[in-house]
Every structure is written in C-alpha cells, then in structure tokens.
C-alpha cells in the first residue's frame, strides 16, 4: 500500500505511539520524537493547542500531538486532563477509590489530537469520546488508567482487551479515525 504521508507524532509515551501506529495502519508513516512540551493547566482543547503550537515551533514543520482525559460524572468531569497527575500520585486503585463512594461510576474517556502543518499554520483538533464505567482495577494489558475503564457495551476493561480489541473501540481510535479522514481528504 502506498504511504500517504509521513507524520511526526510528538510523544514520550511508547504505548500511545504503538496505539497510533496500529490504528492508522500502513497508510501513514508515523515517526516519533519526545520533546519536553509545556503542559499548561486548562481545558483539553487549550492543552492540545498549546502543545501543538510549541511542537511546531521546535520542529519547524508538521506535527501531531495528543492529550487524553478521564472524567467522572459524579465529579463533574474530574480528573479530566489532569488524570496523568492523579495517576502518578494515587495509581489506578486510587483513581477507582476516588469515585467508589459515589452512586454512579459513569465516566467518559477522551482523546484529542492536534495536527498542524507547521508554525503559524492552523491547528486542527480531532476528538474521540467514549462512555463507560470506572471499575476496580482489572487486567494487565495496557497502561495508565486502562485497568479501571470499562467501555459501555463491553465486559472488559481496556487492560483486559487485546491491543487489537482496544484499538478498534477506544477513545483514541475514534479520534484517530477523524484524523485519518482529514489527512486523506487533504491528499485528494
């Protein structure tokens, strides 16, 4: 198959990199570099826009960045884009315990990609959101908070799924499909 485009995905997370490569398949050559980008406090959109702008300035060319979040309905969307910091502090079990006393364990998992052709160029955002439940940690395949998020309509957490299963239904998959469609339309 012909490669449509080479994309520099700026991330230090090897698991996210592997997921994106698996989801986008062989139509795109995904290259990677881990730059130390600012992680501002703000909405997911603000975080991704700032990361994409900073990465484009460093690279002086096209870049892709990503931010994920996990929001608990009982906590009005927290921890949201700060889930990484909560996870580093309390781990998956602590993330579950944060919501365990509430009646509802409903949550949303979200992923937002930011893509730009370079410094000063428009930044395009692609978001995927998936409804699910926060459950006690289960499974060992995956990373981050995968062991506590069970998508609605599924009997397994992300960490209990194979990479192929997770990458065919995840919040990252939904966002990556929008990104793929955009990139393919740009080539036509």
From Swiss-Prot:
Listed SUPFAM superfamilies: ITPase-like
Taxonomic classification: Eukaryota, Fungi, Dikarya, Ascomycota, Taphrinomycotina
Quaternary assembly: Homodimer.
Record's subcellular location: Cytoplasm; Nucleus
Keyword annotations: Cytoplasm, Hydrolase, Magnesium, Manganese, Metal-binding, Nucleotide metabolism, Nucleotide-binding, Nucleus
Function recorded in the entry: Pyrophosphatase that hydrolyzes non-canonical purine nucleotides such as inosine triphosphate (ITP), deoxyinosine triphosphate (dITP) or xanthosine 5'-triphosphate (XTP) to their respective monophosphate derivatives. The enzyme does not distinguish between the deoxy- and ribose forms. Probably excludes non-canonical purines from RNA and DNA precursor pools, thus preventing their incorporation into RNA and DNA and avoiding chromosomal lesions.
GO cellular component, one term: cytosol
Binding positions for Mg(2+) per the UniProt entry: 39
Protein known as: Inosine triphosphate pyrophosphatase
Cofactor binding note of this UniProt entry: Binds 1 divalent metal cation per subunit; can use either Mg(2+) or Mn(2+).
Uppermost EC category: hydrolase
Cofactors named for this entry: Mg(2+); Mn(2+)
Species of origin: Schizosaccharomyces pombe (strain 972 / ATCC 24843) (Fission yeast)
HAMAP family attached to this UniProt entry: HAM1_NTPase
Pfam families reported in the protein's UniProt record: Ham1p_like
Similarity comment text for this entry: Belongs to the HAM1 NTPase family.
CDD domains in UniProt: HAM1
EC number: 3.6.1.66
UniProt GO molecular function: dITP diphosphatase activity; ITP diphosphatase activity; metal ion binding; nucleoside triphosphate diphosphatase activity; nucleotide binding; XTP diphosphatase activity
Catalytic reaction equation(s): ITP + H2O = IMP + diphosphate + H(+); dITP + H2O = dIMP + diphosphate + H(+); XTP + H2O = XMP + diphosphate + H(+)
Superkingdom of the source species: Eukaryota
GO biological process terms held by the UniProt record: cellular detoxification; deoxyribonucleoside triphosphate catabolic process; DNA damage response; nucleoside triphosphate catabolic process; nucleotide metabolic process
